[in-house]
Design a protein with these regions (language model features):
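Short acidic low-complexity segments
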Residues: 33-47
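N-terminal Rossmann-like dinucleotide-binding module
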Residues: 1-34, 168
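Predominantly a Rossmann-like dinucleotide-binding segment in NAD(P)-dependent oxidoreductases
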Residues: 107-180, 184-186
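C-terminal helix-rich "cap/oligomerization" subdomain common to oxidoreductases
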Residues: 20, 49-54, 64, 96, ...
Length: 304
């Protein structure tokens, strides 16, 4: 499968490396290393799929162009639009043209995320009471210096979309009623530290995201009837640890199993191989999770 990269920034360059021999050319209006300035300049005969890593406000028209010309699409998260129905329209168009439109959330391929999913699905935890996640990095100044990044909902759509996607990955039937617990603009014009949550969902969910965490970090605590499960850090920031604690009744030190990984971030390559495979199988486009994420984000912003 021959791929082009649209948007040759930090993410685009990563995608190009992961595509390996499949990568044929790049598109970027300002990066001098790019082969083309506009996607329309790339000969349609030269590629089968596009890895799209552009600002949110440019995504929809590029997606439509690619679908119209029967090209598979990997679009860097999040897939945002002011019109919620646009997500369904894109899905319908992709199905009609028999192409794959896949939104990239590479954290789905994090080993401990998958391990957590399996544990939750197994039922070993019993009734799950609560899930709290924290995702933070120290990019506040980089965002502040970027005109197109320091605007709108800031960290909520950037890192919050990751956390919502993870929530939906672990609990597919989770509800839509989330709200702000706190929202701060410590250094930036747009929010750079946000906490959202849902007390009406089962389990209850609390998601904290920050651009003012000077050492990049991720934590997760899942508390349940028969035990608990915890993740500390990600492979890219390693080492990353998964802990499963089995409850001892009526009380006492739990039986603990710990798995620590120290390895290079595998998620980008795994995600590209996944994308390549679903294109090969002509899997039908499913943007239902994108629809859910956008609906939740819109409700949070409206305070509903």
């Amino acid at each position: 499968m021959r791929c082009i990269v649209v948007g040759l920034g930090v993410q685009g360059e990563k995608r190009a490396i992961c595509a390996g021999k499949d990568y044929v050319s790049s598109v970027d209006p300002v990066n001098p290393k790019a082969d083309f300035k506009k996607i329309q300049d790339v000969p349609l005969i030269a590629y089968d799929a596009a890895l799209v890593c552009v600002p949110d406000n440019q995504k929809i028209h590029i997606i439509k162009y690619l679908i119209k010309n029967q090209k598979h699409i990997l679009i860097e998260k999040p897939l945002l639009t002011n019109n919620l129905n646009m997500i369904k329209n894109i899905e319908k168009m992709a199905k009609q043209m028999k192409v794959v439109c896949y939104t990239a959330y590479n954290n789905r391929f994090e080993p401990h995320y998958i391990r957590m999913k399996k544990l939750i699905t197994s039922g070993k935890l019993g009734k799950i009471y609560s899930c709290r996640m924290f995702y933070g990095n120290g990019t506040a100044r980089l965002v502040k210096n970027s005109k197109w990044r320091d605007k709108d909902q800031g960290v909520l759509t950037d890192l919050g979309s990751h956390l919502l996607d993870t929530t939906k990955f672990w609990w597919d039937d989770i509800g839509e009623k989330f709200k702000f617990y706190s929202k701060n603009c410590f250094e930036n014009r747009s929010p750079d530290h946000v906490i959202i949550g849902s007390e009406e969902s089962s389990p209850r969910i609390e998601l904290e995201m920050s651009l003012v965490m000077w050492r990049n970090h991720f934590t997760c605590d899942v508390l349940a009837e028969k035990g608990s499960a915890h993740i500390s850090s990600l492979c890219k920031w390693g080492p990353t640890t998964f802990v499963y604690r089995k409850r001892v009744l009526p009380s006492g030190k739990p039986i603990e199993r710990k798995i620590t990984l120290k390895k290079k971030d595998p998620t980008w390559v795994l995600e590209y191989e996944y994308f390549k495979n679903i294109c090969k199988k002509s899997q039908k486009t499913d943007l239902s999770r994108d629809y859910w994420i956008l609906k939740v984000l819109q409700k949070i912003q409206r305070g509903k």
